[in-house]
Amino acid sequence: MIESYLAFIFLNKVNKKKAPSLDSLGYEEIKKRHDELVKLIRKYDYAYYVEAHPLVSDQEYDNLYHELETLEKLHPELITPDSPTQRIGETPLSGFSQVTHEIPMLSLENTYSKEELFAFLERIKRALPGKKISFTVEPKIDGVSISAVYKNGLFSLGATRGNGTVGDDITQNLKTIRSLPLRLETPDPPEYLEVRGEAYMSPKDFERLNAQREKEGKVLFANPRNATAGSLKQLDPRVVAERPLAVVFYGAGKLVGMKCKTQEEWLNFLKKIGLPIPIVFWVCSNENEVYEAIGKLNECRNQLPYPTDGAAVKVNEWEYYSLLGYTAKAPRWAFAYKYGAERAKTRLNNVIFQVGRSGTITPVAEMDPVFLSGTTVSRATLHNFDQVKRLDVKIGDVVYLEKAGEVIPEVVGVDLNQRRGTEKEIVPPEFCPSCGEKLSWEGIFLRCENENCPAQLKERILHFAQRNAMDIQGLGESLVDQLVDKGIVKDVADIYDLDEETLVNLDRMGKKSAQNLLKAIEESKKKDLSRLIFGLGIPHIGQKASEDLARYFGTMDKLSHATEEELLNLPFIGEIMARSIVNYFRKEANRRRLEKLRKKGLNFVSTLSQASSGTLSGKTFVITGTLSEPRESIAQKIISKGGRVSNSLSRKTSYLVVGSDPGSKLQEAKKLGIPLINEQELLEMLHGG
């Protein structure tokens, strides 16, 4: 009977005949077939999306998938969370909730130097005298860091790294990625399994995606990593499902109900239960084998399906991780060796001058298109005029290109042997190419001091509206050009005065587009203070610093009145950053902008802010020495309970937290009579003990 039903499903596609009633099959037969289909499709998904070896034709796969959809439509009670039909949600999200990483997601220290790599390996051996140590060498994948949680084998939570301590809940978006199994392939799954890795887009898929976007008149993505990050930030999982994303896992987070002894054992375990892992990795017993493996990886990395920019070298034995510990930002048991940037050669045809949001003039080279590190490049930065002089680069030269950080194309050299004598000097402009104001030099930088400069305003608006700031979807480059050029928007705050009547009269803006944009603008008012701080574009203040400032000060009023001295006491703020913040809020134009944003109803209070009446309220802590967790993670826990963390001791310091190998602060605290506590005592205070 089931075979008869399958035959009719297929014939239905060809002859448009109706399938027989499923009632005649019997419920148990239907349920059994449903389970078979789920397992079959999961098997075919793994073969196609992970192993790149399809087991059936597209038509056969589609027939099975359609049959499963039909069964579940007629019997919705059969739908399980791991069914392939449940990957794509029907309803867009209103926003991303936050996920706290119980074990922080850290980055790796890195180097381009063989000597520094060997020094790292030597430090490991010195820290573990007499121990037998081996190392793994894995591809350092240039994607977006993610965490995936499986409870009793079922995928239940996905998150971004965020600031390492708190990330975004992207569960619904990760479910759309076919290489991520919704259920682990094991009859005895761990109670709780957190795996960490990367979401990525292959260079070939990236090129195809951009080609399609170009046909549709959409803004192109800069590189595969940006395309991946932008896709995961989409609120509508249906949009994410259309993007060619994949995942690969290599790291461990929180584990309950399982143990591994080595990184090699962990990777093999992940592969066994159906999770995609790096295609190649090596286990090495000494530094020479490590360096040899790094060389082998470099030879084959362009054949891998994911972009890589180096090798991750890790201590293989997990038991040593707690002994080696962590720095403030990275584990001491792992290190990244980065390969020298890939180079390309092309002719420089022209130089244009771009005006940044702070008024800095950047010379940009226009060149014959050339393929470089996964993308076709026709423009590259020359950074500044000091760099132009140092390279002795001229219009008409054949130049060498690299991608800074594997992202931004830059001119790094000139092939002087190909000079023809017709090349032209690159002359710095005397007047701003946007507003016509006379330019002035500030060190090696050429700047436009006119804050009303249209080019600066456009860049400020685009920065303010970007995904990591106020996330105003629809406010792209083309529309911003029109709004500024027509004099409709003269300040960032003016975007909150836009109305439907104004927008529908602009090019490529219909009624629906205008309504969607206005909705996005209204929604942006609810964004957390951290996003607003980042969106303001304060020089030297990035996304993470913005989150830290919002968490510490809690309100825009407190931040805007902070002194340089107060800022310098924060563990995450340096001298240049502190001065930049104070100078920003001193400017009258910036104060006026903030007041207008306040009146328009933007959120000036952070949900990330420290508890005003927490267990550590009113107490100030200074940390010295090495703790079991990164210092930044400990500091965030103190702040979340209402406490403050400072870099320097004073008579107002409540406690000095003392870890192993403390510095000079220990003696200084004793002289000042400041109470000393260890990490365990701090943890008891954090939990109200």
Swiss-Prot record:
Record-linked InterPro entries: BRCT_dom, BRCT_dom_sf, DisA/LigA_HHH, DNA_ligase, DNA_ligase_AS, DNA_ligase_CS, DNAligase_adenylation, DNAligase_N
PANTHER family: CHROMOSOME TRANSMISSION FIDELITY FACTOR 18, DNA LIGASE
Function noted in UniProt: DNA ligase that catalyzes the formation of phosphodiester linkages between 5'-phosphoryl and 3'-hydroxyl groups in double-stranded DNA using NAD as a coenzyme and as the energy source for the reaction. It is essential for DNA replication and repair of damaged DNA.
Enzyme class, first EC level, given as a word: ligase
Binding site for NAD(+): 58-62, 107-108, 138, 161, 198, 314, 338
Gene3D superfamilies assigned: 5' to 3' exonuclease, C-terminal subdomain (1.10.150.20), BRCT domain (3.40.50.10190), DNA ligase/mRNA capping enzyme (3.30.470.30), Helix hairpin bin (1.10.287.610), Nucleic acid-binding proteins (2.40.50.140)
Residue ranges occupied by any BRCT domain in the UniProt entry: 611-689
Listed cofactors: Mg(2+); Mn(2+)
One GO process term, biological-process aspect: DNA repair
GO cellular component term of the entry, any: cytosol
Gene name linked to the record: ligA
Active site positions: 140
This protein's record includes keyword Metal-binding: yes
Its EC number(s): 6.5.1.2
Name this protein carries in UniProt: DNA ligase
Keywords, ordered alphabetically: DNA damage, DNA repair, DNA replication, Ligase, Magnesium, Manganese, Metal-binding, NAD, Zinc
GO molecular function: DNA binding; DNA ligase (NAD+) activity; metal ion binding
Binding site for Zn(2+): 432, 435, 448, 453
Family: Belongs to the NAD-dependent DNA ligase family. LigA subfamily.
Catalyzed reactions per annotation: NAD(+) + (deoxyribonucleotide)n-3'-hydroxyl + 5'-phospho-(deoxyribonucleotide)m = (deoxyribonucleotide)n+m + AMP + beta-nicotinamide D-nucleotide
Domain of life of the organism encoding this protein: Bacteria
